[in-house]
């Protein structure tokens, strides 16, 4: 008889405060900005090209309610249900009949930004530093996962999982003082993970899986109320220098980029049961490289080229 198991709803806080940092991701059109943050969710956009998304603080590894109850401790060595496929493909060989597991993780992030922003025209500071703070910039999310495993014969087992390993969404209001650094940021991924396990003997199993990942992302910066007011205030000075500044509309995008890509990787594992009471496991998930391609757009007029400043996303 086939055994079907549906895991309970997972509820976890996935994102916590991050170290001081911020990233510029567009040419700083008018001024050199100095912007310090004590916390910033948007740094996770660097995971798009990172060799280890799981180290970026936005991992989604709640594939099992059982594992969540242990804070994922020893997850690769605890084949309680089919979701073990995500952490150790070798361990799917433990099951003597087909199993299906499904989970839903509710991610309730609590990310607050607290800092200030200052402006300069050339090397000359303009005005006093202004606050750039906002609460609860990251959205809640429901993240599903599905897993199926089944023995093929006495030696071989196979399975497949559909889940995500990382993702985020953040959004700032028009009142955020540093909206020209960060406005909307969203990363969505889904991974298809077929896997096989081979039983070397009664105690030892080895497993291998393929990771086929689709990712899409959107990042952008916008015109804040503060920036629009600052540019308007600089207009007379710029006019005296022979420079005409455009009128900025709060809420319009300075820079918006969206794209998608497919990436491929692999995972492998070893599962050893030296005794009935002891499990030993070793697992590894290789990097999946993603190079997103898409479109870039802006709702804001371009500033004079001599006032542009370089920007980058690391």
For each feature predicted by the language model, list its residue ranges.
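Short, often N-terminal, low-complexity regions
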Residues: 4-9, 18-23, 40
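Long, low-complexity, polar and repeat-rich extracellular regions
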Residues: 5, 24-28, 61, 71-73
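Short, Lys/Arg-enriched N-terminal segments with co-localized hydrophobic residues
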Residues: 14-30
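Gram-negative bacterial Sec-dependent N-terminal signal peptides
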Residues: 31-54
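Outer-membrane beta-barrel porins/channels
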Residues: 56-71, 120-133, 140-314
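Transmembrane beta-strand segments of Gram-negative outer membrane beta-barrel proteins
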Residues: 58-74, 93-112
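Outer-membrane beta-barrel pore proteins
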Residues: 75-79, 85-96, 148-154, 167
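Glycine-rich loop at the start of a catalytic domain that most often binds anionic cofactors/ligands
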Residues: 97, 114-121
């Amino acid at each position: 008889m086939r055994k079907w198991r549906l895991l309970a709803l997972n509820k976890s806080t996935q994102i916590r405060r991050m170290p001081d940092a911020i990233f510029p991701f567009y040419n700083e059109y008018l001024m050199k900005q100095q912007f310090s943050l004590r916390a910033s969710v948007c740094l996770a956009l660097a995971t798009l090209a990172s060799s280890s998304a799981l180290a970026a603080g936005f991992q989604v590894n709640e594939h099992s309610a059982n594992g969540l109850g242990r804070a994922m401790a020893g997850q690769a060595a605890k084949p309680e249900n089919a979701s073990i496929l995500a952490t150790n493909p070798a361990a799917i060989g433990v099951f003597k009949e087909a199993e299906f597991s499904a989970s839903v993780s509710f991610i309730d992030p609590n990310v607050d930004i607290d800092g200030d922003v200052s402006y300069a025209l050339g090397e000359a500071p303009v005005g006093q530093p202004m606050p750039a703070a906002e609460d609860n910039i990251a959205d809640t999310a429901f993240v599903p996962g599905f897993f199926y495993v089944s023995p093929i014969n006495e030696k071989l087992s196979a399975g497949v999982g559909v889940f995500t390993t990382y993702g985020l969404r953040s959004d700032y209001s028009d009142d955020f003082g540093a909206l020209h650094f960060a406005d909307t940021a969203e990363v969505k991924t889904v991974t298809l993970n077929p896997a096989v396990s081979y039983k070397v003997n009664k105690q030892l199993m080895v497993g291998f899986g393929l990771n086929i990942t689709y990712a899409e992302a959107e990042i952008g910066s916008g015109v804040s109320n503060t920036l629009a007011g600052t540019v308007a205030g600089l207009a007379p000075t710029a006019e005296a220098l022979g420079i005409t500044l455009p009128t900025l509309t709060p809420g319009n995008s300075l820079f918006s980029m969206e794209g998608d890509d497919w990436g491929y990787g692999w995972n492998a594992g070893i599962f050893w049961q030296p005794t009935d009471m002891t499990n030993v496991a070793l697992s590894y998930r290789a990097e999946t490289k993603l190079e997103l391609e898409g479109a870039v757009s802006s709702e804001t007029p371009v500033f004079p080229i001599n006032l542009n400043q370089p920007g980058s996303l690391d």
